């Protein structure tokens, strides 16, 4: 039977190493990826929520590669596996800033990973989205270019 | 024996029974066991799964499950007896509320396989003894419940069960004062033995009363024991202090009264099928069985290292309560209330780590009892465990996440029960123990954050006259420290920490806005050029921000300044924090860059207090920054934990002691001492971490800081006059004293080892009475 602390099916394609090495690091990791955050959610809010599972070692906010502003994800590292597991169990799928946030294991933060990997600088998912999401810059980047090509140059 | 089960039929004649009578002709098997023989390993594994499933409410008939299991055993597992018994033991230990189902399974096997019955009885009696020897008291409670149910399933004889119960109670038999037994055997042990017997009586009392003349004597022993014992811990462990409308009772007193009432009703079968009796469906079959005699138990005696389950006080908020849908909560003294709670507690205990699964099980359980307000009871049990004193079994967020999940699943039921519960707690806040205050605030802010902070704030604000959001510099007016005022203030601040200032201004009604402090911006006082130190701050700012100066250059600027040393530290601190004020990450980056400068500047206590003063000044309006930055300074080893303690208890922070963040900081400070591996530098191997934390030095340091904290509590309380009830000073003293108790509770394992030191402190001459009482009650409870 699956539990809340099992590895999800997502694998970071940029991981340097074999699939089994990747899974081993995920299994030993004390770092979490946190996704579906609002662009406006601050590090302080994340700290408040995640420190309820244990002492947070470090939070790395995900930033737009070009604008250097938050782009809706972050990494949270704890001191122990048990604390990280608590966050997987009790925070994943609950609300922060009125959004259901996603918490998943991460193999550990490496410099450069704090930046969005999309062409426009943010996360890839925000380029292809077709819905309107006020917390993540409105429509997806591609769609909003089509809708209003002249107003997106601010 | 034949009439036994026929007679007991009148306990209940349920639909399930009817179903059984009809079913045999078109029985649907749950298992393909007769079709295919399984290999040994698979069979044992399948058996384990099926046994666990006996404790799950899923609509399948219990009788069918039991029959299948016994067929499955006979077909596949005759050669794996030891494995089967081990699985059985782990099930009865984990699921004491389902002991009757497991006993029925054994009862069914015992009919065709007397040898299995005999082995099971001996195995369990052995397990009972070893679990007691190993201080696994909860385990032995489960085994005991199971053995008692074996009697109901006609597996063991009445006389031998009575002997076992008598053996358990032998230490509870009244002893003359000064008698050796009462001196040696602690009350916790006798309480537990009495509890073990008492908790089995609802399911077995009627039969024993009819069958055994000695049962009356047993009840009398229990009665005398419970009535004569003095539950000293009750006052300390009760969440509500005297004067609250919520009745709360010591767990053993309460259980006795519930059982006594049941006896007075001639052991009337509890309503709503709260007692499972699956064996009734098999009474004809079971009545043909031969019984075993339980081997006499050689009770392991008390030793120096024996540790017993702590006493509890039962948490109640829904007394004499009629739920909005007209369903009546079982009365407090009814055995139904006890059984309902026990079953909910068991689901929580087994599934608490998986909030979704746990919610499913709780919802299914509620569904199976449509005529009872189970939802209210679930909320009461969860809140009760979460607020439990001295500490709760799991972290607050665990309980909160389950309640959020339940609320999503049953939006028409759970949120209403949470609301009613919260309203009742809010109304009783004055008498709530300070030691569970933070848990309540943390839970509630998180719960609200999951539902858009939607709450009847206005109603809560009405009764609360207390004034503004406190600033340490402000004078405070009467009513500011009133419990409800403090609660609302802290709750709203915590909500803001999970959200943001503007949102809170939109969520809160007009009459509550005064509880919201001003936006939590930094306050950089050196912007005013007339303030001493402003010139130095300009130089530093320009160097750090303008040209990202190296630490050496900053040191040179500081050396060149003619300002006083402590002022320099203050300026340096505030400039760094001001530059990094955008976020924690920015702050940490600046502090790390100039770490060496700080290390050169800061050594003594007063120098360390100067940097702390800088933090508290710049972030006067932002408690979270104060707490996180100071914790970081300890981790960076710029500030020492012991000086953070002396800072917190310094006279200028008196008002701050009424706020939650300062205690958050104090706990975090203790944790840095407990886990020295978490101090920078960063990465350490797991082996180094373990070695560091197990060092004797660490234990000495932890003892040192915890003792220092108690000393500071005593001192700060001794220096305050309490004032008349209702005054700010009175509230302040009660609150700080409650915080001291919280420290004793949270670190009770450590404080236990410092018994003699605590005794010494409590004997000092100029102590406040409340302080002495708190320490003495703690010592009595733990020793």
Swiss-Prot record, chain A:
GO terms for biological process: mRNA cis splicing, via spliceosome; negative regulation of viral genome replication; primary miRNA processing; regulatory ncRNA-mediated post-transcriptional gene silencing; siRNA processing. It comes from the Eukaryota. CDD domains: RRM_NCBP2. GO terms for cellular component: nuclear cap binding complex; nucleus; presynaptic cytosol. PANTHER family: 20 KD NUCLEAR CAP BINDING PROTEIN, NUCLEAR CAP-BINDING PROTEIN SUBUNIT 2. Residues 9-23 have a biased composition (Basic and acidic residues). The keyword Nucleotide-binding does not apply. Residues 30-108 form the RRM domain. Residues 1-23 are annotated as: Disordered. Component of the nuclear cap-binding complex (CBC), a heterodimer composed of Cbp80 and Cbp20 that interacts with m7GpppG-capped RNA. Interacts with Ars2. MRNA binds at residues 10, 33, 102-106, 113-117, 123-124. One of its GO terms (molecular function) is RNA cap binding. It comes from Drosophila ananassae. It holds the Pfam family RRM_1. Belongs to the RRM NCBP2 family. Keywords: mRNA processing, mRNA splicing, Nucleus, RNA-binding, RNA-mediated gene silencing. This is Nuclear cap-binding protein subunit 2. Component of the cap-binding complex (CBC), which binds co-transcriptionally to the 5' cap of pre-mRNAs and is involved in various processes such as pre-mRNA splicing and RNA-mediated gene silencing (RNAi). The CBC complex is involved in miRNA-mediated RNA interference via its interaction with Ars2 and is required for primary microRNAs (miRNAs) processing. Also involved in innate immunity via the short interfering RNAs (siRNAs) processing machinery by restricting the viral RNA production.
């Amino acid at each position: 039977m699956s539990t809340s602390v099992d590895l999800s099916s997502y694998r970071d394609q940029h991981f340097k190493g074999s699939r089994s090495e990747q899974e081993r690091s995920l299994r030993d990791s004390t770092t979490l990826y946190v996704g579906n955050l609002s662009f406006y959610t601050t590090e302080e809010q994340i700290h408040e929520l995640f420190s309820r599972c244990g002492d947070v070692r470090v939070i790395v906010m995900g930033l737009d590669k070009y604008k250097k502003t938050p782009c809706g994800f972050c990494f949270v590292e704890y001191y122990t596996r048990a604390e990280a597991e608590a966050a997987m169990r009790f925070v994943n799928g609950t609300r922060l800033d009125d959004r259901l946030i996603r918490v998943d294991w991460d193999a550990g933060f490496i410099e450069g990973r704090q930046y969005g990997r999309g062409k426009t600088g943010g996360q890839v998912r925000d380029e292809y989205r077709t819905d309107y999401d006020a917390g993540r810059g409105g429509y997806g980047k591609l769609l909003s270019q089509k809708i209003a090509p002249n107003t997106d140059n601010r | 024996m034949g009439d036994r089960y026929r007679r007991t039929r009148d306990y209940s004649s349920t639909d399930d029974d009817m179903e059984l009578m009809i079913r045999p002709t078109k029985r649907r098997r749950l298992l393909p066991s007769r079709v295919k023989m399984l290999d040994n390993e698979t069979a044992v594994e399948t058996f384990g799964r099926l046994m666990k499933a006996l404790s799950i409410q899923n609509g399948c008939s219990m009788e069918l499950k039991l029959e299948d299991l016994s067929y499955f055993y006979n077909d596949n597992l005759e050669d794996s007896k030891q494995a089967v018994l081990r699985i059985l033991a782990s099930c009865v230990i984990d699921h004491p509320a389902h002991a009757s189902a497991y006993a029925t399974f054994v009862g069914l096997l015992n009919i065709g396989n007397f040898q299995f019955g005999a082995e099971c009885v001996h195995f369990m009696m052995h397990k009972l003894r070893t679990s007691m020897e190993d201080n696994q008291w909860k385990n032995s409670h489960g085994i005991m419940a199971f053995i008692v149910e074996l009697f109901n399933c006609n597996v063991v004889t009445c006389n031998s069960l009575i002997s076992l119960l008598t053996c358990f109670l032998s230490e509870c038999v009244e002893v003359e004062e000064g008698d050796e037994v009462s001196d040696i055997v602690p009350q916790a042990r006798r309480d537990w033995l009495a509890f073990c017997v008492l908790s089995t009586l609802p399911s077995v009392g009627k039969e024993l009363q009819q069958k055994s003349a000695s049962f009356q004597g047993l009840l009398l022993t229990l009665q005398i024991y419970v009535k004569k014992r003095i539950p000293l811990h009750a006052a300390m462990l009760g969440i509500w202090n005297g004067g609250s409308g919520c009745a709360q009772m010591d767990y053993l007193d309460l259980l006795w009264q519930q059982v006594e009432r049941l006896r007075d009703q001639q052991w009337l079968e509890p309503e709503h099928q709260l007692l499972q009796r699956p064996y009734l469906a098999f009474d004809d079959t079971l009545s043909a069985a031969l019984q075993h005699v339980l081997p006499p138990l050689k009770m392991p005696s008390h030793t120096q290292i024996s540790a017993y389950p702590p006493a509890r006080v039962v948490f109640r908020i829904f007394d004499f309560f009629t739920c909005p849908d007209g369903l009546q909560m079982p009365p407090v003294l009814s055995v139904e209330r006890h059984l309902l709670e026990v079953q909910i507690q068991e689901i929580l205990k087994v599934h608490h780590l998986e909030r979704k699964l746990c919610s499913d099980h709780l919802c299914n359980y509620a569904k199976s009892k449509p005529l009872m307000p189970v939802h209210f009871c679930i909320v009461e049990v969860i809140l009760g465990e979460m607020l439990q004193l001295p500490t709760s079994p799991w972290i607050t967020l665990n309980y909160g996440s389950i309640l959020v999940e339940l609320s999503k699943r049953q939006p028409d039921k759970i949120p209403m029960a949470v609301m009613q519960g919260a309203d009742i707690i809010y109304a009783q806040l004055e008498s709530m123990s300070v030691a569970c205050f933070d848990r309540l605030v943390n839970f509630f802010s998180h719960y609200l954050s999951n539902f858009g902070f939607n709450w009847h704030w206005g109603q809560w604000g009405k009764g609360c006259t207390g004034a503004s959001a406190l600033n340490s510099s402000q004078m405070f007016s009467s009513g500011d420290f009133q419990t409800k005022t403090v609660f609302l203030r802290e709750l709203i601040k915590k909500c803001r920490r999970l959200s943001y200032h503007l949102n809170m201004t939109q969520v809160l009604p007009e009459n509550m806005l005064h509880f919201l402090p001003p936006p939590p911006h930094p306050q950089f006082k050196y912007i005013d050029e007339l303030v001493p130190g402003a010139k130095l701050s300009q130089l530093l700012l320009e160097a750090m921000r303008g040209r990202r100066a190296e630490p050496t250059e900053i040191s040179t600027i500081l050396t060149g300044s003619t300002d006083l040393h402590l002022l320099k530290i203050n300026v340096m601190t505030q400039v760094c924090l001001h530059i990094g004020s955008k976020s924690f990450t920015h702050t940490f980056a600046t502090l790390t860059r100039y770490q060496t400068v700080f290390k050169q500047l800061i050594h003594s206590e007063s120098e360390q207090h100067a940097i702390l003063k800088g933090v508290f000044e710049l972030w006067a309006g932002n408690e979270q920054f104060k707490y996180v930055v100071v914790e970081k300074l300890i981790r960076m080893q710029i500030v020492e934990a012991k000086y953070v303690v002396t800072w917190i208890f310094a006279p200028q922070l008196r008002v701050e002691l009424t706020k939650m963040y300062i205690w958050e900081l104090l706990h975090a400070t203790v944790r840095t001492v407990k886990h020295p591996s978490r101090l920078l530098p960063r990465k350490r191997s797991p082996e180094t971490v373990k070695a560091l934390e197990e060092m004797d030095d660490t234990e000495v340091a932890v003892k040192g800081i915890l003792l220092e904290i108690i000393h500071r509590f005593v001192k700060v309380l001794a220096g305050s006059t309490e004032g008349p009830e209702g005054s700010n000073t009175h509230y302040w003293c009660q609150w700080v004293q409650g915080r001291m108790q919280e420290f004793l509770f949270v670190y009770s394992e450590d404080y236990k080892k410092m018994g003699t030191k605590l005794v010494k402190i409590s004997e000092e001459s100029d102590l406040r009475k409340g302080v002495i009482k708190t320490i003495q009650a703690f010592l009595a409870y733990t020793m």
